[in-house]
Regions:
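N-terminal accessory segments
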Residues: 1-178, 213, 358-361, 366-370, ...
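Residue-level recognition of alpha-helix initiation/capping sites
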Residues: 35, 80-81, 224, 289, ...
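Short acidic-aromatic active-site loops that bind/stabilize oxyanions
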Residues: 30, 187, 191-199, 336-344
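Conserved adenosyl
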Residues: 2-6, 132-326, 361-366, 371-373
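C-terminal alpha-helical "lid/dimerization" subdomain adjacent to the S-adenosyl-L-methionine
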Residues: 311-356
């Protein structure tokens, strides 16, 4: 199908297409969330490596609503609806797509229904949203960012720019971390997100060239959540005695782990002593002033040869179009919308925090999963 006007400026046509795609961009994450919650990607994965399934085959494998064996039993239009959703994901290389020949010479086999002419499979990208051998994926992160509590805060972004304030606080009347205590379902999604993403990142860190845990005897994870990070670290480094430190209401939900002691408290008051402190995705939640107070508390808790192991994204000074940079800028805006003073930082900003907190400098040790492992040394 040729363009109506072959003399049109192709560059202008492309720019127009890009602008329309941008205007409609919210469609993709909402469709992706529905596909994840319907367990479509899981159904394709369970069909085996390299499997390609038609919409009807996928629909037949999905758990049905209450009282129905499959979703088709309740909604005969489900295969067509799935097809329309999945072809969008294929256009973003989230799924593969192949087309069945409807005019096959094999007269013994019935021609597939029109809705089933497309077959869908998983790309390497899609596999990050299917539970891996550890039962974790990025699916909870996708669902968390689409949670109504977060989505509603974006409607206050304009007002926050005009009047000041934090969008999340404007909507809910309290900071995001306090809101977690109010909404158990939201808290559950948040904790699952932290566990899954931490497990994925931690495994990559432990498989990387980073050797910073080898000489550590006592490791304190500040803001360690339910302790999954320390469980992985101590499993790989059994010589380490670890303290998982977080707010008391978080620690109450933490399961027991060998070599890990759970301690509740307030990191802005004090932190437990150790010869190394781990902080992963902590500093980006807080303003510079809060970070300096926290870092000074860490400085007091460490011996002269102690260090903080910081795991965070590091912003480039100049924006570029790489996926890593886009992800960091998106996370930076998540922080701005949800946390007072929360932000991603550049190398220079991390150095200013380190020296302001009493540390001599920073070593940028290893780059894993778009994150830097940094050491703040005394």
């Amino acid at each position: 199908m040729a363009p109506c006007d072959t003399n049109k400026d192709q560059q202008e046509e492309q720019q127009y297409s890009n602008a329309v795609e941008l205007a409609l961009s919210p469609v993709l994450p909402f469709v992706m969330k529905a596909v994840v919650e319907l367990q479509v990607l899981d159904a394709i994965a369970e069909a085996g490596p390299g499997a390609q399934l038609s919409p009807s085959q996928i629909a037949s494998r999905l758990p049905g609503p209450a009282g129905a064996a499959t979703i088709v039993e309740r909604n005969p239009d489900a295969p067509e609806m799935l097809d329309r959703m999945l072809r969008l994901l294929a256009s973003y290389s989230i799924l593969t797509c192949s087309v069945v020949d409807l005019h096959s010479d094999d007269h013994d086999s019935p021609a597939p229904a029109l809705v089933d002419r497309r077959l869908y499979g998983l790309t390497p990208l899609a596999k990050y949203f299917v539970p891996d051998q550890d039962g974790v994926s990025l699916a909870p992160l996708l669902c968390l960012t689409q949670e109504k509590a977060f989505v509603d805060s974006w409607y206050q972004l304009k007002g926050a720019v005009l009047e000041g304030g934090i969008p999340f606080h404007k909507v809910h009347g309290k900071p995001a971390f306090e809101y977690l205590r109010k909404d158990p379902m939201f808290n559950e999604v948040f904790n699952k997100t932290m566990i899954d993403r931490s497990t994925m990142v931690n495994k990559k860190i432990l498989e990387s060239s980073y050797k910073g845990f080898e000489q550590v005897q006592k490791l304190v994870d500040v803001g360690g959540g339910l302790g999954a990070t320390l469980n992985l670290i101590t499993s790989k480094n059994p010589h380490i005695k670890a303290i998982n430190f977080d707010l008391p209401h978080v620690i109450q939900q933490a399961p027991p782990y060998p070599s890990v002691e759970h301690v509740g408290g307030d990191m802005f008051e004090s932190v437990p002593k150790g010869d190394a402190i781990l902080m992963k995705w902590i500093l980006h939640n807080w303003s510079d002033d809060h970070c300096l107070k926290l870092l000074k508390n860490c400085h007091k808790a460490l011996p002269d040869n102690g260090k903080i192991i910081v795991v965070e994204g590091v912003l480039p000074v100049m924006p570029d179009s790489s996926g890593a940079t886009k992800g960091l800028f998106q996370m930076d805006l998540q922080m701005m919308a949800q946390h007072f003073g929360g932000k991603e930082r550049t190398q220079e900003e991390f150095l200013a925090l380190a020296t302001g907190g009493g540390f001599s400098g920073i070593k940028f040790e290893c780059f894993v999963c778009d994150l830097w492992i940094m050491e703040f040394y005394k």
